[in-house]
Amino acid sequence: MAYFSGLSDALRLTFVQIMILSAIAVVIFLYGMIGNFQKWGAGVTGYALEPPTGKKGSAIRFLKTWWAQVRAESHHHGKPILEVLILDIFFQRRILKRSPIRWFMHFTIFAGWMSLFALSGLMFAVEMTEKIGIELPFTPAEFREMLSLPNYIFGYILLIGVMIAVVRRLFVSEVREASIMYDWVLLGGVFIVTISGFIADGIRTGIIWGFGLDPVTAPPAALFHSVISLLFCIAYIPYSKYIHVIATPLAILANKGGE
């Protein structure tokens, strides 16, 4: 199957090259996560804070402690784990109770982002299945075409959430005044990843998002989107405020959710 990304139409990325780039991003991510687990194991709870001098936590001990707390008998306000997963983590009911608009923004970003990630995982699974010689009723290229519609749908859902976030940061005074540089970097990164995906697809297909750009630029545009997605959406997470997408669910599960 030919990939859309490349330096040019004649120099498109291969499966092995895509896997190497992905592996690099995953290794950087895992290294950062181990560091975060060590800090949390040492009692650090704030973003960008370091453990006290001479104190070093254990990633394994942190995970064991967290899992023990998740499995511990529920305290008075605790909720069943399945309820916490569905209502507190997926549907984010805590945010909904505080602000419906903010909830809609968060939910569209979360649902769009995670759905696109899941679709990418399915695409990877189909490619790997073919590589190991298992025959499927469709080729990877045909499966990619099947995923095009849901990719568009969830891409636009993500875009709606991102645009709401941009408008809030720019024009809602209390949100703008409370924003710090980390917030702008996070939002800017998500915006660039989202828009670059639409533009890369638009150049290739000739739809409105192509803005009349030469089709020759389609492979480099797709390559830019692929690389920045791997860097920002995977490798950068443990080193940024974006770590809250992992830390918050862990804390909610450990506390058994609820209000």
Curated annotation (Swiss-Prot):
Organism whose genome encodes this protein: Methanosarcina mazei (strain ATCC BAA-159 / DSM 3647 / Goe1 / Go1 / JCM 11833 / OCM 88)
Catalytic activity line of the entry: methanophenazine + coenzyme B + coenzyme M = dihydromethanophenazine + coenzyme M-coenzyme B heterodisulfide
Enzyme Commission number(s): 1.8.98.1
Membrane topology: Multi-pass membrane protein
Functional note: Part of a complex that catalyzes the reversible reduction of CoM-S-S-CoB to the thiol-coenzymes H-S-CoM (coenzyme M) and H-S-CoB (coenzyme B). HdrE may be responsible for anchoring the complex to the membrane.
Cofactor (UniProt): heme b
GO molecular function terms noted in the UniProt entry: CoB--CoM heterodisulfide reductase activity; metal ion binding
Name this polypeptide is given: Dihydromethanophenazine:CoB--CoM heterodisulfide reductase subunit E
Family label: Belongs to the HdrE family.
Primary localization class, coarse: membrane
Classification lineage: Archaea, Methanobacteriati, Methanobacteriota, Stenosarchaea group, Methanomicrobia
Extra remark beyond the main annotation: Methanophenazine seems to mediate electron transfer from F(420)H(2) dehydrogenase to the dihydromethanophenazine:CoB--CoM heterodisulfide reductase.
